[in-house]
Amino acid sequence: PARCRRCGTCFGACPERVISFANYNIDQIGSMIREVQVPKDFKKEGPRILILACENDAYPALDMAGMRRKSWSPYCRIPVRCLGSVNAIWVSDAMSKGFDGVMLLGCKYGDDYQCHFVKGSEICNRRKENIAETLNRLGVQPERVDQLEVAIDEYDKVPDLIDGFVARI
């Protein structure tokens, strides 16, 4: 506990959902996902996607894009402490709820990493690969769940990232 940075990356690995913080826990995000009203008409509304966005870079980039009157396909966005905190249960809840895709939008990782918690986006990418294998076994196209990277100052790219994801679905 003394070395905990409160990033939540342990959430994504915990199958029992017992790890929590006072103001952030697995069930809280799961409840947000389950309470979203998903449009019924795919043909009329287009693909229904959920965006789980890192609150450090991606979520502020989404907000800045909106403040600058950028436009993109409608969607629902939910902030997460770090993409490393994304639990497969959240993706499962979203797909069960009727979302056509889940976009994981976070900080850059790899050699040019910008993750505030260093490995969060990288950990999420590994978990996304496991989710893709599970979706494939269930007969669901694994590309319905994708992870994309954005820096806080790349808000002008956000509409293209979202529209590109929607087009792939």
Where are these regions (language model features)?
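Iron-sulfur cluster-binding cysteine motifs and their immediate structural context
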Residues: 1-32
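Disulfide-bonded cysteines in secreted/extracellular proteins and peptides
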Residues: 4-10, 14, 54, 82, ...
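A short, flexible N-terminal coil/short beta segment enriched in small residues
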Residues: 24-56
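Conserved acidic residues
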Residues: 49, 75, 100
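Short, charged/polar "capping" segments at the starts of alpha-helices
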Residues: 57-62
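Short helix-loop-beta junction
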Residues: 66-78
